[in-house]
Every structure is written in structure tokens, then in C-alpha cells.
Amino acid sequence: MQKYWWHKATIYQIYPKSFMDSNGDGIGDLKGITSKLDYLQKLGITALWLSPVYDSPMDDNGYDIANYEAIADIFGDMNDMDELLVEAEKRDIQIIMDLVVNHTSDEHAWFIEARENPESPERDFYIWRDEPNELVSVFSGSAWEYDETSGQYYLHFFSKKQPDLNWENPQLRQKVYDMMNFWIDKGIGGFRMDVIDMIGKIPDQLIDTNGPKLHDYIKEMNQASFGKHDLLTVGETWGATPEITKQYSNPDNQELSMVFQFEHIGLQHKPDSPKWEYEKELDVSALKAIFNKWQTELELGQGWNSLFWNNHDLPRILSMWGDTGVYREKSAKALAILLHLMRGTPYIYQGEEIGMTNYPFRTLEELNDIESLNYAKEALEKGASLENIMDQIRQVGRDNARTPMQWDASKNAGFSTSDKTWLPVNPNYKDINVESALANPESIFYTYQKLVALRKTQDWLVDADFELLETTDKVFAYIRKTKDSSYLVVVNLSDQEQDFCYDFERAEVVIANTELEPITDQGKLQAWDAICVKMK
């Protein structure tokens, strides 16, 4: 298998509004990110994925783009972006830009022209119909919005301020590739591609994802932009299977480096239900089956996967499947060890490395997220209780991931000097923050630091086979095996003691959140025990 730099990379995702505020306006910005590069270098990560920093009215926090080649005022300007690229490069950190080309903002020059001049070339950059069909928006309600100016409906799978682009138009596609090359010429390390599986949609046939021309478009994009460069490209593909992922990420196909698959994330809510109908407990046996499928069916050389628990759209993994009480640190380390020792490129979401948790939202006024607010409005109209809605939002709402990064125990967790931050700071910041994590050699941070270092240096993490072991329900154990060596990873995903008997003779500990001896002596795993050993 041909090796690429991203096989041994760990990527750190930054949500710019919430990372670090340099100018005291309560909103994170590019200068703030640059000021924290030394911290990220200490963690050891290879690249930063920046959620969108482009010019935007911020209807969906930057995923509604008005100008792809300008920076939103709240984040700074292009000089700040260039400075971030230069300073990151000095520290051997690549910058991965968020590519949002399923839709634009309705304030993008293309859409303004399309709306005002139905005869313009830009009109066909978007999808217009005389009558709507039954397609619905991800953010609730119809996916069609009537435009009084031109007397037609336009398609928006997200908010009505995010009109979908018409990828069947070759001029539109070329404009996208030109924009991508603008960023490639600036020296970025790649693209994370937002809902890329939607660009092949055929609305008249009710096809929203995985349309018949999807892979043709991605191949064309590859040839016209990043394919000539050694860049990381990762597609957000909610419906991907291992078979579909081979199509995207087999190097012979010349499409993408890897995808984000979300099958394990689906366990957060009840089967075939909206995300708001969340599961109160993790089904560990289902999690084992899903990871086993992805680790064994996406074979080495046939494609590549990403490994993640958190991102800007998901609840904090500790609040979902870990322990936010007495075992917070131990469960955070256990979840990290379990994930990072599989095959794939790991992604760390800001604050994950210090064990940040969900926010205790009490009222709708504390929220910012359009998805949560739209859901609450719709659910209230249908007679749901506010108490129940707030419980759901506290558990799975997107703002949980977006509260400000917790740097220290000072005002606003050291994120901002402002009297009001754009989202409230989690009240637990005095206990959970970077400063206290760095001061404690046993903190979650140093487990992540070690996992990042292992990924860079240990070839077996890329090459080794994966074998799931038969264990009790709450124990997740697997072996990574090459022709020369084998590594055993064992994690107790519960706060109860679990049986685990294995011949550990002459095993050498690689990383752990516990001691090996009690496990070998008693055949028992204590709450949230996690260990990786090299078998002799």
C-alpha cells in the first residue's frame, strides 16, 4: 500500500467562534487560534481542521458562505489567515479548510444575481422549480422556499438562507474548482468536505444523497484541484458503508483520502428515529459490531477511514457515553485509547483532550444553534413540553460542542475578556481547563499526547490486521496483528467491574489508564479500565 502523510497524522478540529478570542468581543478569531499554536504543537497534532472562517452572515455559524475568498469580519481578515498559515507551518502543522459547496448563503453574489436576474448564468447555479415537492429540510420544514422576486421556489436542504447549488452546471463546478485552487495556492494542507454526498442530488427523483453523478463530480474535482498535490481530503458522508467508502477513498479511484462515516454515532439515538429521540445508554455490543465491520471490511489499501467521537455537530462524548462524575478522567482516557489504536486517521475536537462536557442549558434563550431552535419551535407547536425539549437539547443539541474552550480558571475560562461570550462558558471550567490539565502529569491531555505520538511512530497502527475478541457485553477488546507482532487493546466501557481473562505472559504495556497487574492477577477489569499491551 502506498503510504501518505495522513496515515500517521492526528487532526485537531477547531470551531473558530469558540476557540480563543484575541480582541475581547466574546467571539473566537484567527489571531486567537494563532496565539494557541504552541499549545497544539505540545499536543503533537499534524493538522488543524478549521470550521468555516469565510465571509458569512452566520445564519448557520459560517456554513452559509457569502464569499469563499474572504474572511468573516468576526474572525479577522486575510492577513490574519496568512499569518496563521505561516505560523502553523513553522510548527509543522497543516491547515485543513472546511469546503462547503453543497450550498451557499443567500447573500452570496451568485444567489443575489440569480434571484434578481432570472436570465443570468448564475440563475442555473441554483435549483429552481415552479412547484415544490415533498423534500424536507434537515433543519425542519419544507426544503423549498418561495422567492417572490422571480415567482419560483428554490431548494435548500438546510436553512432557507442556504440555497443548494446545482452541480449539474459545469460553469458552477469550474467556479468551485477555481476557488479551491485559490486556497491550495495559499499553502493549505487539504479540505474537509461538508455534506459532500449531497452534491449529486436529483430533487425531482427525491434523491438527496449518493446521486448517480456524485463520484463523477468528485473525480472531476480531484483532477481540477487537489489531485495534483499531496493534500488530505475528507468527505462528510452520513450514509457511507465500507463498500461506498472504497469508492470514495481507494487511491486507484482518484477521489478522496478518506471519509467520515457516522454509523457509530447513530447509536446515540433510537433506531430509525430523529436524533432528538436519544438512547439513554450505549449499546456496547452494537458499537463493537460497527467498529469491527469498518475495521475488517475496509481492507488495507482499498480505502481509508477516519476515527472520531466528537465534532461541532455532536454532543460531547463524555456526556453521551462516558462518565461526567467520579470517572470523568478515566472514562475520557478509556474512550480515547479504544478509538485511537484502530486503523484510520484520528480526529480530536477542541476540548476533548481535557475532557470537556455538555452544557447544562436551562432555557431556549441560552441557545444559538438554528437546528435546536427550529426543532424546539416545531415541537412546542406540536404540544411537546418545554421541559422535555430542553432535556433533549441538553443531551444531543449541537451547542454542547460549541461552548467556549476552557483555558484556565480565570474569567470566561480565559477564552475572552468580554463581559458576554457568544455562547455561555460551561460552569465547570474552574475544574476542567487546559492550565490544570497541563499541570497534572496524569491528566487526560497527556494520554492524548501519547496517543498522537504513537500514531506518528508506530507502523502497526496503520498496517496491522484487526480482530475483535469475544468478551462480556461491556468489554471491548481487540487485537492488532502484523506478521512480526501483536497488540492487545482492552477497554471496560462501564463503571462496573467486568471479567476479563487472558494470558498476558510477558506483555509490555504500550499505554493504559490503569495498572496491568490487578487485571492479570484477578482476571477482572475495574470501572473504565483501558490498556494496550504488546504481546511477546
Predicted regions span which residues?
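Active-site regions of oxyanion-processing enzymes, predominantly non-cytosolic
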Residues: 183-193, 305
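Acidic/aromatic-lined carbohydrate-recognition and catalytic surfaces
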Residues: 2-177, 181, 185, 196-251, ...
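Loop/helix patches that line or flank the sugar-binding groove of alpha-linked glycan CAZymes
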Residues: 5, 225, 232, 239, ...
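Flexible loop/turn segments at secondary-structure boundaries
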Residues: 56-57, 103-105, 198-203, 240-245, ...
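Beta-strand-rich binding/interaction modules
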Residues: 497-515
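C-terminal beta-strand-rich structural cap/linker in extracellular carbohydrate-active enzymes
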Residues: 520-536
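Active-site clefts of carbohydrate-active enzymes
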Residues: 202-203, 304-325
